[in-house]
Amino acid sequence: MRLPIFLDTDPGIDDAVAIAAAIFAPELDLQLMTTVAGNVSVEKTTRNALQLLHFWNVDIPLAQGAAVPLVRAPRDAASVHGESGMAGYDFVEHNRQPLGIPAFLAIRDALMRAPEPVTLVAIGPLTNIALLLSQCPECKPYIRRLVIMGGSAGRGNCTPNAEFNIAADPEAAACVFRSGIEIVMCGLDVTNQAILTPDYLATLPELNRTGKMLHALFSHYRSGSMQSGLRMHDLCAIAWLVRPELFTLKPCFVAVETQGEFTSGTTVVDIDGCLGKPANVQVALDLDVKGFQQWVAEVLALAL
C-alpha cells in the first residue's frame, strides 16, 4: 500500500532531489504539490516546480501558495540556490499552469476528498501549513501527520541558532508547532549529515536523464561542493517516510522564538525536559549516513 502524501515545497535545488524521490519512491503516492516563497520568490518556486513536473511528464496537481510570510518581510536563499532557484539546466518550455486557488485551500479541498488521512510533507517555510491550520481547523482530523525539513536542536544555518525554513516565517512555524497535529522534524541535526559524496555525484551524468539534470543543478548549489560533498537537507523528510529506521528520533517539546533580537526563528528543543512541558514534536537527532546514501542511490536509479 503506497503512502499518500501532499508536498509543500520551495524549489530550490535540494527540493528538486526531494521531489524526484517523492515521485519515484515506490512506497509513496504523491497526490498534490504546493509552492511557497522561500529559497526564491513564490513565482520562481512555482515555475521551478512546474518545470520539474513537465520534465518527468507526471500529472500531479500543483497550487501556488503564499508569496510572503505571515507578518514579516520575506527573505530568500538565492545565495545558496542561485537567483532563479534552479540554475544550471535548460528545461524545455511548457504550458503547464498551477491550479486557480491558493495552496492552503487546495490542501484543504484535497484533504476533505481523501478516503483516509494524508501525510503532509513541508520542505520550505511553513506559511501555507499555518494558513491551513488557522483558516481551516476542520482539516486537522484529516492530517495523518506533518513531516518537515526545518529547525535545529543546536546551531542554525542562517543565524547562529536558526535554520532557514523556520527563520523565514517564525510566526507560521510557531502556529504549526502549537497546533496539536503530529509532527516529525528533520532539522539540521540530521540534514547536515545527509551528504552525497563526490564519488557518487560523479556517477550521476551516466545514471539516467534525472541524474544528468541533477548533476547540472548541483554545480550551482552552495550547500557544500562537488569536491567535498553536498548536503541534501530537504531529501531527509522524504527519506524518513520511506526509511524511518535510518533516523533516531526523540519526542520533545519544541517552541519557536519569534521575539528575540538575535534568536528569532530559533527552534527551542527541550531535549532534557527542563521546561516540564509535554512533547509536541518527534525530533530527528541522528542519521545512519551510509544507509541514507544507499537509499538515495536506489531511488534515483528508478527515476526517468
UniProtKB/Swiss-Prot annotation:
Record EC number: 3.2.-.-
Membrane spanning stretches: none
Gene3D superfamilies the UniProt entry points to: Ribonucleoside hydrolase-like (3.90.245.10)
GO biological process: purine nucleobase metabolic process; purine nucleoside catabolic process; pyrimidine nucleobase metabolic process
Active site: H233
Keyword Nucleus: no
GO MF term set: purine nucleosidase activity; uridine nucleosidase activity
UniProt keywords, alphabetically: Glycosidase, Hydrolase
Annotated GO CC locations: cytosol
InterPro entries found in the cross-reference section: I/U_nuclsd_hydro_CS, Inosine/uridine_hydrolase_dom, IUNH, Nucleosid_hydro_RihC_nonspecif, Ribo_hydro-like
Similarity annotation: Belongs to the IUNH family. RihC subfamily.
Function: Hydrolyzes both purine and pyrimidine ribonucleosides with a broad-substrate specificity.
Record NCBIfam families: PRK10768.1
Protein name (record): Non-specific ribonucleoside hydrolase RihC
Organism of origin: Escherichia coli O1:K1 / APEC
Gene that this polypeptide is encoded by: rihC
